Swiss-Prot record:
Gene3D superfamilies named in the record: Photosystem II PsbZ, reaction centre
Protein name: Photosystem II reaction center protein Z
Keyword Transmembrane among record annotations: yes
Domain of life (superkingdom): Eukaryota
Stored InterPro entries: PSII_PsbZ (IPR002644), PSII_PsbZ_sf (IPR036512)
Annotated coiled-coil segments of the chain: none
Function: May control the interaction of photosystem II (PSII) cores with the light-harvesting antenna, regulates electron flow through the 2 photosystem reaction centers. PSII is a light-driven water plastoquinone oxidoreductase, using light energy to abstract electrons from H(2)O, generating a proton gradient subsequently used for ATP formation.
Membrane topology: Multi-pass membrane protein
A Pfam family matched in the record: Ycf9
Localisation: Plastid, Chloroplast thylakoid membrane
Keyword vocabulary terms for this entry: Chloroplast, Membrane, Photosynthesis, Photosystem II, Plastid, Reaction center, Thylakoid, Transmembrane, Transmembrane helix
Species per Swiss-Prot/TrEMBL record: Populus alba
Membrane spanning stretches: 8-28, 41-61
C-alpha cells in the first residue's frame, strides 16, 4: 500500500510540474487555447483525480 501511495504522490508532482509549464504556454500562444483546450481540461481532471487518490490513500495508510 505504501508503494501505491508513493507512486500516486509522484504522479501528482509530475502532473503538477507539467501543468505548471504547459498551461501558461497554451494561454500565451496565439491559437493555443482553442486548439489545446481538451488537453488542458484532461490534464486538470487528471490532477484533481490524483489529489483525491492521494487523500484516500493517505487516510488508509495513517
Amino acid at each position: 500500500m505504501t508503494i501505491a501511495f508513493q507512486l500516486a504522490v509522484f504522479a501528482l508532482i509530475a502532473t503538477s510540474s507539467i501543468l505548471l509549464i504547459s498551461v501558461p504556454v497554451v494561454f500565451s500562444s496565439p491559437d493555443g487555447w482553442s486548439s489545446n483546450k481538451n488537453v488542458v481540461f484532461s490534464g486538470t481532471s487528471l490532477w484533481i483525480g490524483l489529489v483525491f487518490l492521494v487523500g484516500i490513500l493517505n487516510s488508509l495508510i495513517s
